[in-house]
UniProtKB/Swiss-Prot annotation:
Residues 276-701, 758-772, 817-1224 are extracellular. Residues 1-33 are annotated as: Necessary for nucleocapsid assembly and virus assembly. The keyword Protein biosynthesis does not apply. InterPro entries: Alpha_E1_glycop, Alpha_E2_glycop, Alpha_E3_glycop, Alphavir_E2_A, Alphavir_E2_B, Alphavir_E2_C, Flavivir/Alphavir_Ig-like_sf, Glycoprot_cen/dimer_sf. Keywords: Capsid protein, Clathrin-mediated endocytosis of virus by host, Cleavage on pair of basic residues, Disulfide bond, Eukaryotic host gene expression shutoff by virus, Eukaryotic host transcription shutoff by virus, Fusion of virus membrane with host endosomal membrane, Fusion of virus membrane with host membrane, Glycoprotein, Host cell membrane, Host cytoplasm, Host gene expression shutoff by virus, Host membrane, Host nucleus, Host-virus interaction, Hydrolase, Lipoprotein, Membrane, Palmitate, Phosphoprotein, Protease, RNA-binding, Serine protease, T=4 icosahedral capsid protein, Transmembrane, Transmembrane helix, Viral attachment to host cell, Viral attachment to host entry receptor, Viral envelope protein, Viral penetration into host cytoplasm, Virion, Virus endocytosis by host, Virus entry into host cell. A lipid is attached at residues 730, 750-751 (S-palmitoyl cysteine). The record marks 200, 233 as: Involved in dimerization of the capsid protein. The keyword Transmembrane helix applies. It comes from Venezuelan equine encephalitis virus (strain TC-83) (VEEV). This is Structural polyprotein. The modification Phosphothreonine is found at residues 93, 108, 127. A motif (Supraphysiological nuclear export signal) lies at residues 41-48. The active site is at residues 152, 174, 226.
Length: 1254
């Protein structure tokens, strides 16, 4: 699960046999402590055997002897040979002399691996060292006929020809270059811009290339390697190394490389150091010296060495000085000492513990700090005791040493207990730090038993398991998926974090004072001094002693105080220890067990059961642990949801044609798109048509049905009213005339009895004979009314909802078009040029990157409160010194320690003073756990396009800015700018744990306590730290020496708890957010204008292409709103065989094919996508056109897992069947109205004619 295996893993559980085992004889149990000691002895022997095997030189003579030894043998003659042979024989028979063996032993070089051997072979003639003062300061290499050397590397190239070349400087790339002579060009490297992710080779082994960055394991490569090349498997140079920076367990390299166009590109990580071999100088007594070669070391002059380290504590070469001071020159180096041996400069101490077995006490195992910020369940403690050292200060694994009233004692680490709610498993310890794995609890206790006395110390601290990912599990799973996390390193490597040390102050030790008879005796420990202060009968005594001395003036132990003095050991700068008088010599040592990037196994929640509906998705969830469900719409408004689900639940969501995404726990995101489908049949009966359109367009369908119902109702009502009025108008004259006969037609129409009157034919005959113009007008009135009503109904109701787009074609070889900015959607078009055959163009964007220009404002992380040991002055006053550290607070407290009581044991009562100082610094794990605040500016867009022009194809990267062209085969392509200047990033963004957040952070220097940005630094390693944490010092109690304070909680920790989901889950338009560099990919927004400049050579004359004499198009199958769900078959007769471009000038259909092969006679199958129910489009084949039309059916699947590659600006049209039913309905209503109008007209004509006749 974790990248660091525990030092002593627990044994696996034995297999359980389901059958009963036979009874075994009883044996007495062994003592568990004896078994532990045996195991410790076995481990020690195994480690010793392993080290001896590893350090043993290889057997037999060396493969090749040095030239110096060979020349000495020739000069020495036969006598020397005899002596050497005799010496060899004696060495075989007798045991070797250990002193001589150690003195003559040379460090055996490890045999280089295959990668190193290959690089060394290639470097031999093509890489040249740059010498400075007799040392290799860097390297120069010859690549592609040019000499490259880093500009920051001073010195002369170790080649007379190359050293004489006059170089040109490129300060932007930190390089100097020159053309090499012609006779040397055959031996130069070749370079390449191809850099697939994987491993490459250089002088020190393998180099990993990932996400545009070259990294090597930490410790591989150092100063002096600047200018070395990185090679691929074919021996081509992919990059030149300039420097590096440590990033946890790996080192990121600063390199110069080449892009696809052969242009030099430089990549430099933050806080990168140049790797020229520049000697760092340190200072001692106003004399400078190389930090790696100090004049003194700790084993010979410990006090002077600590003073030297204190003077150079802020020097950039402090680490080199510390390593050299610990390892004296000529001293034998053991592999265990190389791990972490600098803590021999320190000693353990006793400090106040707030909760021992019975209240507070002065404990040898006081707990200073506890941290458990990793995702692996481990806890790192800092205590007053030390680990890995014995009582004498020598390295000894699995051992704890502690201070017991001035005497340093040791105890095996397995006898130390650590527990929270249950016992913890101690992994290892180094210096003041202990690494353990503990169960959850609200406090942590450490204890051990020595000489029947149990020592313990407890501190309140909530220990809990911190899960990583989107599932809140409480224990690491056995199976799952690997995810990036932060774990505590199980080693003591230098990872850039320090803990502050200083010389211990004068500690009162009452055990040194005893009463012998009637006088006081002070006995200092062996090898140390003691400061004695007494006040006996008005006589004050103050002197330093290094052996036992009696003071006859004093008769009581309370009259004297004895202080232990030691200036050859450091202690941790704890607030529980008093500060030494005068200028305190400070230092710093490395902190082990820091957080590092690793891989953790996280659980996978059971897959949700998905049920698809019409534009909806139902998720049935069964989480084992509390699991987050995150959803968003892939449109302009994401409408994201973020819900923690702990119990089985069902959630329903709406899915649109633009897409919907959900993330369940630690599963990868899943996306779904809705299709233009619905129940019913758009080509069926009226109720099926209504059902279909009601589900697709509910509001429009309801509105249309309401209008139709209103028209029918009005029509029926109007017809009825007209009929009644006509009947009344017809019958009224006859009712008023006695014995009048009603004509037969009126009697039938008006349901009246017939009466004698002039008939219709008689009236028409009268008009024909007397007024023929009126006769024709009377006949044309009903026909005119019918025509007018029909036209009005068609204008009102028959609105065609189609959008027609112009085809993308250009009459010349300069062609401009626009394609959607959506990855994976192919865009096909043709170029029509007079006299030439159509030229097909196909463009498919495979990836679209939007990279903003960002500026790092500051870095913030969890803070650590540093406290100086309090300065205590008895019988006197003090003042605060000027403060210069971040958020530093200083305060003087008077009257803190009563007379001869309390932590200071002062002789005065109220004149005693204490100066308390506290300040803020970055936490030890800030390098691994921090957030970066950026300001984002104008974004650049890169499109990775697969372009086909005619029969020529290329995969290229285009900057979508409207200015940068791409050329291939004579075609010049310019893309952009984007139609929509849009970006998912706000002006202020925060990067944390590989994810990006839009967050309005405070400006640099304006942080508030308890909020994001309470501490700010320009970079992780810079010293310009700003802090505002509301740090307030409190008055100390007299019982113990300490520095109490209050402080606001960490704003960074609070932000981590309260932060919303990152842009990875909330960005609009389905953007995919990545880091290194910060970018958004595949945002489906806007369109990309394209301009083509096509040479004449790519066009084909019309005479050389086929011509269709007859063509007929039939739609075999058609599913609208589906991914190329239409199949068209074109039967044709061509003039000759050949290849023709196909295209649809309108936007009704999108073709899958850009060209088809034609024979003299046959058929061609073409796939297309459309959003119309009744598509009708003109298909261009070469220079001929053929019309395709037919009916399309809705898709069967409601939800699909990929977007639809058709023109999504179209919506499905109303089917012809629906229009037929609609016009029939409206036509029926119109017939009633027309009949009523005709009747009214006939009646009016008849009445008027009859009145005129009478």
């Amino acid at each position: 699960m974790f990248p660091f295996q525990p030092m002593y893993p627990m044994q696996p559980m034995p297999y359980r046999n389901p059958f009963a085992a036979p009874r075994r004889p009883w044996f007495p149990r062994t003592d568990p402590f004896l078994a532990m000691q045996v195991q410790e002895l076995t481990r020690s022997m195994a480690n010793l055997t392993f080290k001896q095997r590893r350090d043993a030189p290889p057997e037999g003579p060396s493969a090749k002897k040095p030239k110096k030894e060979a020349s000495q043998k020739q000069k020495g003659g036969g006598q020397g040979k005899k002596k050497k042979n005799q010496g060899k024989k004696k060495a075989k028979t007798g045991p070797p002399n250990p002193k001589a063996q150690n003195g003559n032993k040379k460090k055996t070089n490890k045999k280089p691996g295959k990668r190193q051997r290959m690089v060394m072979k290639l470097e031999s003639d093509k890489t040249f060292p740059i010498m400075l003062e007799g040392k290799i300061n860097g390297y120069a290499c010859v690549v592609g006929g040019k000499l490259f050397r880093p500009m920051h590397v001073e010195g002369k190239i170790d080649n007379d020809v190359l050293a004489a070349l006059k170089t040109k400087k490129a300060s932007k790339y930190d390089l100097e270059y020159a053309d090499v002579p012609q006779n040397m060009r055959a031996d130069t490297f070749k370079y390449t811009h191809e850099k697939p992710q994987g491993y490459y080779s250089w002088h020190h082994g393998a180099v990993q290339y990932e996400n545009g960055r070259f990294t090597v394991p930490k410790g591989v490569g150092a100063k002096g390697d600047s200018g070395r090349p990185i090679l691929d498997n074919q021996g081509r140079v992919v990059a030149i190394v300039l420097g590096g920076v440590n990033e946890g367990s790996r080192t990121a390299l600063s390199v110069v490389m080449w892009n696809e166009k052969g242009v030099t590109v430089k990549y430099t990580p933050e806080n990168c150091e140049q790797w020229s071999l520049v000697t760092t100088m340190c200072l001692l007594a106003n004399v400078t010296f190389p930090c790696a070669q100090p004049p003194i070391c700790y084993d010979r002059k410990p006090a002077e060495t600590l003073a030297m380290l204190s003077v150079n504590v802020d020097n950039p070469g402090y680490d080199e000085l510390l390593e050299a001071a610990v390892k004296c020159p000529g001293r034998k180096r053991r592999s265990t000492e190389e791990l972490f041996n600098e803590y021999k400069l320190t000693r353990p101490y006793m400090a106040r513990c707030i909760r021992c077995a019975v209240g507070s006490c002065h404990s040898p195992i006081a707990i200073e700090a506890v941290k458990s910020d990793g995702h692996d369940g481990y806890v790192r403690l800092q205590t007053s005791s030390q680990y890995g050292l014995d009582s004498s200060g020598n390295l000894k694994g699995r051992t704890m040493r502690y201070d017991m009233h001035g005497t340093i004692k040791e105890i095996p680490l397995h006898q130390v207990s650590l527990y929270t709610s249950r016992p913890c498993h101690i992994v290892d310890g180094h210096g003041y730090f202990l690494l353990a794995r503990c169960p959850a609890g609200d406090s942590i206790t450490m204890e051990f038993k020595k000489d029947s006395v149990r020592h313990s110390c407890s501190v309140p601290y909530e220990v809990k398991f911190n899960p990583v990912g989107r599932e809140l599990y409480t224990h690491p799973p056995e199976h799952g998926v690997e995810q990036a996390c932060q774990v505590y390193a199980h080693d003591a490597q230098n990872r850039g974090a320090y803990v502050e040390m200083h010389l211990p102050g004068s500690e009162v030790d009452s055990s040194l004072v005893s009463l012998s008879g009637s006088s006081v005796t002070v006995t200092p420990p062996d090898g140390t001094s003691a400061l004695v202060e007494c006040e006996c009968g008005g006589t004050k005594i103050s002197e330093t002693i290094n052996k036992t001395k009696q003071f006859s003036q004093c008769t009581k132990k309370e009259q004297c105080r004895a202080y232990r003095l030691q200036n050859d050991k450091w202690v941790y700068n704890s607030d529980k220890l008093p500060k030494a008088a005068g200028a305190t010599l400070k230092g710093k040592l490395h902190v082990p067990f820091l957080l590092a990037d690793g891989k953790c196994t996280v659980p996978l929640a059971p897959e949700p059961m998905i049920t698809f509906g019409f534009r909806s998705v139902s998720l049935k969830l069964h989480p084992k642990n509390p699991t987050y469900l995150i959803t968003r719409q892939l449109a302009d408004e994401p409408h994201y949801t973020h819900e923690l689900i702990s119990e089985p639940a069902v959630r329903n969501f709406t899915v649109t044609e633009k897409g919907w995404e959900f993330v369940w726990g630690n599963h990868p995101p899943k996306r779904f798109w809705a299709q233009e489908t619905a129940p019913g049949n758009p080509h069926g009966l009226p109720h099926e048509v209504i059902t279909h359109y009601y589900h697709r367009y509910p509001m429009s369908t309801i509105l249309g049905l309401s209008i139709c119902a209103a028209i029918a109702t009005v029509s029926v009502a109007a017809s009825t009213w007209l009929f009644c009025r006509s009947r009344v108008a017809c019958l009224t004259p006859y009712r008023l005339t006695p014995n009048a006969r009603i004509p037969f037609c009126l009697a039938v129409l008006c349901c009246a009895r017939t009466a004698r009157a002039e008939t219709t034919w008689e009236s028409l005959d009268h008009l024909w004979n007397n007024n023929q113009q009126m006769f024709w007008i009377q006949l044309l009135i009903p026909l005119a009314a019918l025509i007018v009503v029909t036209r009005l109904l068609r204008c009102v109701c028959c609105v065609v909802p189609f959008l027609v787009m112009a085809g993308a074609a250009a009459p010349a070889y300069e062609h401009a078009t626009t394609m959607p900015s959506q990855a994976g959607i192919s865009y096909n078009t043709i170029v029509n040029r007079a006299g030439y055959a159509p030229l097909p163009i196909s463009i498919t964007p495979t990836k679209i990157k939007l990279i903003p220009t960002v500026n790092l404002e500051y870095v913030t992380c969890h803070y650590k409160t540093g406290m100086d040991s309090p300065a205590i002055k008895c019988c006197g006053s003090q003042e605060c010194t000027p403060t210069y550290r971040p958020d530093e607070q200083c305060k003087v407290f008077t009257g803190v320690y009563p007379f001869m009581w309390g932590g200071a044991y002062c002789f005065c009562d109220t004149e005693n003073t204490q100066v308390s100082k506290a300040y803020v610094m970055k936490s030890d794990d800030c390098l691994a756990d921090h957030a970066e605040a950026y300001k984002a500016h104008t974004a650049s867009v890169q499109a990775f396009l697969n372009i086909t022009v005619g029969e020529h194809s290329i995969v290229t990267t285009v900057y979508v800015n409207g200015e940068t062209p791409v050329n291939f085969n004579g075609v010049k392509i310019t893309a952009g700018p984007l139609s929509t200047a849009w970006t998912p990033f706000d002006r202020k963004i925060v990067q944390y744990a590989g994810e990006i957040y839009n967050y309005d952070f405070p400006e640099y220097g304006a942080g508030q306590p308890g909020a994001f940005g309470d501490i700010q630094s320009r970079t992780v390693s810079s010293s310009d730290l700003y802090a505002n944490t509301n740090l307030v010092l409190q008055r100390p109690k007299a019982g113990a020496i300490h520095v109490p304070y209050t402080q606001a909680p960490s704003g960074f920790e609070q932000w981590k708890k309260d932060k919303a989901p990152s842009l990875k889950f909330t960005a609009p338009f389905g953007c995919e957010i990545y880091t290194n560099p910060i970018r958004a990919e595949n945002c489906a927004v806007g369109s990309i204008p394209l301009a083509f400049d096509i040479p004449d050579a790519l066009f084909t004359r019309v005479s050389e292409t086929p011509t269709l004499s007859a063509a007929e198009c039939t739609l075999n199958e058609c599913v609208y709103s589906s991914d190329f769900g239409g199949i068209a078959t074109v039967k044709y007769s061509a003039s000759k065989s050949g290849k023709c471009a196909v295209h649809v000038p309108s936007g009704t259909a999108t073709l899958k094919e850009a060209a088809v092969e034609l024979t003299e006679q046959g058929s061609a199958t073409i796939h297309f996508s459309t959003a119309n129910i009744h598509p009708e489009f003109r298909l261009q084949i070469c220079t001929s056109y053929v019309t395709c039309k037919g009916d399309c059916h809705p898709p069967k699947d409601h939800i699909v897992t990929h977007p639809q590659y058709h023109a999504q600006t179209f919506t499905a049209a109303v089917s012809k069947t629906a229009w037929t039913w609609l016009t029939s309905l409206l036509g029926g209503s119109a017939v009633i109205i027309i009949i009523g109008l005709v009747l009214a007209t006939i009646v009016a004509m008849y009445v008027l004619t009859n009145q005129k006749h009478n």
